[in-house]
Amino acid sequence: MSNPQQLRYSKEHEWLSALEDGVATIGITEYAANALGDVVYAQLPEVGDTVTAGETCGELESTKSVSDLYSPVTGEVTAANQDVVDDPSLVNSAPFEGGWLFKVRVAEEPADLLSADEYTAFSGN
């Protein structure tokens, strides 16, 4: 399993893209997707919602369990991936591409995000 070098990672197994005009794309890692099993339902934050770093903002339901979704940053949601709502299996099949979850206009990027190498060491994958 490979964690893309250009992304940053949280200890809750979310990834965050580099800021583009102050907006970051967020998803869960391949490690988290594999641990969840087949995702069958996604409840994502809605456009206009304010999310807070480290707090729950949605959930993913798999054939194994229901898991809270945490935001790695604080800010306003600018997009939610309707494709994932319609086809939650995208989280498993393409966690770093089509399986992204939501986008946030970042108010403040936390300092505790990990590099790809740090996340790999943390997760063991």
UniProtKB/Swiss-Prot annotation:
Question: Any note on cofactor binding?
Answer: Binds 1 lipoyl cofactor covalently.
Name the InterPro entries on file: 2-oxoA_DH_lipoyl-BS, Biotin_lipoyl, GCV_H, GCV_H/Fam206, GCV_H_sub, Single_hybrid_motif
- NCBIfam families from the xrefs? gcvH, PRK01202.1
Read off the HAMAP family from this record. Answer: GcvH
* N6-lipoyllysine: residues carrying this PTM: 64
PANTHER family per the record? GLYCINE CLEAVAGE SYSTEM H PROTEIN, GLYCINE CLEAVAGE SYSTEM H PROTEIN-RELATED
Chain ranges of the Lipoyl-binding domain? 23-105
Q: What GO terms fall under cellular component here? A: cytosol; glycine cleavage complex
Q: What does this protein do?
A: The glycine cleavage system catalyzes the degradation of glycine. The H protein shuttles the methylamine group of glycine from the P protein to the T protein.
Classification from the root reads: Bacteria, Bacillati, Actinomycetota, Actinomycetes, Kitasatosporales
Q: Which cofactor does it need?
A: (R)-lipoate
Per its record, how is this protein called by name?
Answer: Glycine cleavage system H protein
Q: CDD domains from the xrefs?
A: GCS_H
Family that this chain belongs to: Belongs to the GcvH family.
Q: Source organism's superkingdom?
A: Bacteria
Q: Which Pfam families match?
A: GCV_H
Q: What is said about its interaction partners and assembly?
A: The glycine cleavage system is composed of four proteins: P, T, L and H.
Provide the alphabetized UniProt keywords.
Lipoyl
GO BP term, example: glycine decarboxylation via glycine cleavage system
